[in-house]
Design a protein with these regions (language model features):
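Sequence/structural signature of beta-propeller domains
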Residues: 1-195
Length: 195
């Protein structure tokens, strides 16, 4: 008897606008979405192709934490120590306004179905703008999509695990995407250093 074929493509029910996905050491997948009400989800894909989805939500003591005030998540990275890093777009909203919830870099762990050891860093946008005139000019653009305003799209840990690499959707430089780096990820989360 031939085993049933697992479809190559399946709908991911419960996910609406995924922006990034990161496989965790235990085989599950962490997905971030551009959804304020449920920005983080865990997916498990079983051997038979079944997909189980669990939205990560704050515990009672985390309800008012800045960590859960994340809007427009775009990138995920994982380090060897098991910390997950996530970044929001740092872009202005559709009205051209700046919002703290869109300008966050966070670090946390996943323990079972819970977020643990969460930390939030604000000030990445101002640090990038202070060091790079192209990014400073882009940060002033109110119409991000049409005008090439500052917009982070991706995050990755460097191969040596010492830096966080940030991929920008915009601005472009000579028609090419920019990649920036945070040189001190441990320091900003553990010692309150500036990015």
């Amino acid at each position: 008897m031939t085993p049933p074929k697992t479809p190559a493509f399946q709908p991911l029910t419960g996910l609406y606008e995924p922006s990034a996905i990161q496989q965790l050491p235990d085989g599950r997948f962490l997905v971030v979405e551009d959804e304020k009400s449920h920005p983080l989800s865990l997916l498990t894909i079983s051997a038979d192709g079944r997909v189980d989805h669990t939205a990560l939500t704050p515990g009672w003591l985390q309800l008012f934490s800045d960590f859960w005030a994340l809007d427009d998540l775009e990138g995920l990275a994982l380090d060897r120590a098991g910390f997950v890093y996530a970044v929001t777009s740092h872009s202005r909203d559709d009205d051209g306004d700046e919002k703290k919830s869109r300008e966050r870099l966070v670090r946390f762990r996943i323990d079972g179905g819970r977020v643990m050891d969460s930390r939030v860093v604000d000030g990445l946008k101002s640090a990038l703008a202070a060091r790079h005139p192209v990014l400073a000019a882009a940060a002033r653009i109110r119409d991000v999509k049409a005008g090439g305003g500052l917009n982070i799209e991706a995050l990755e840990m460097s191969p040596d695990q010492n830096r966080l690499l940030i991929g920008f959707r915009s601005p472009l430089h000579d028609g090419r995407a920019l990649v920036g780096s945070v040189e001190n990820p441990s320091g900003i989360f553990e010692s309150n250093e500036a990015p």
